[in-house]
UniProtKB/Swiss-Prot annotation:
Top-rank taxon, per record: Eukaryota
Biased composition (Low complexity): 57-67
GO cellular component: extracellular region
Lineage: Eukaryota, Metazoa, Chordata, Craniata, Vertebrata
Species name: Rattus norvegicus
Protein name: Acidic proline-rich protein PRP25
InterPro entries given in the database record: Pro-rich (IPR026086)
Length: 172
C-alpha cells in the first residue's frame, strides 16, 4: 500500500517537472528562429508564432495553463499532486474517523456503569436501605447507646487543677 503511494508521488513529481521544462523550451524556440528567406520580417503579434509553424504546428503550441500538451503522460490526469486537506489514494486506516474527542463528551462506549453512577445525594441512602434502616440512627449526644460501660458516667477526664492519683514524688 505504501509502495504504491510512494511510486505514485514520485511519478507525479517527475511528470510535474517535465512539462515545465518543455514549456520553457517551447517559449524560447519560436522567437529564436529567424524568418525563412523570402518573407518580410514582421513583428510577432501576441499569441502568434513568427514564420511557418513547426512540424505538427497547432499541436505544439505553448502549454495553455490547465491543458495537457500532446498525448498526456500515462495516467497523468489521475496523478495530480494532492490538494491540501484531501487524502491522495485510499485514506489511511481509520483516517477521517479519528477526530480528537470533544471536551466533555466520552469517546467510544461509555465506561461500565458510567452515566448510572451518580454521586449519592447528601442525606439520602443509595440503593436498598440496610436492615432496620431508619431505626439505626447515630446516638444522640448525651444519651448512652446500649448499656453504659461499667462505671461509665463516673469516668470523666480529670478537671484542670484536680490531680488524679497520688501526687508525683518531690511534690509539696
Amino acid at each position: 500500500m505504501l509502495v504504491v503511494l510512494f511510486t505514485a508521488v514520485l511519478l507525479t513529481l517527475s511528470y510535474a517537472q517535465e512539462p515545465g521544462d518543455e514549456l520553457q523550451i517551447l517559449d524560447q524556440t519560436p522567437n529564436q528562429k529567424p524568418p525563412p528567406p523570402g518573407f518580410p520580417p514582421r513583428p510577432p503579434a501576441n499569441g502568434s508564432q513568427q514564420g511557418p509553424p513547426p512540424q505538427g504546428g497547432p499541436q505544439q503550441s505553448p502549454l495553455q495553463p490547465g491543458k495537457p500538451q500532446d498525448p498526456p503522460p500515462q495516467g497523468s490526469p489521475q496523478q495530480k499532486p494532492p490538494q491540501p486537506g484531501k487524502p491522495q489514494g485510499p485514506p489511511p486506516p481509520g483516517g477521517p474517523q479519528k477526530k480528537p474527542p470533544q471536551p466533555g463528551k466520552p469517546q467510544g462506549p461509555p465506561p461500565p456503569g458510567g452515566p448510572q453512577k451518580k454521586p449519592p445525594q447528601p442525606g439520602k441512602p443509595q440503593g436498598p436501605t440496610p436492615p432496620g434502616g431508619p431505626q439505626q440512627k447515630p446516638p444522640q449526644a448525651g444519651k448512652p447507646q446500649g448499656p453504659p460501660p461499667p462505671g461509665g458516667p463516673q469516668q470523666k477526664p480529670p478537671q484542670p487543677g484536680n490531680q488524679q492519683g497520688p501526687p508525683p514524688p518531690g511534690g509539696p
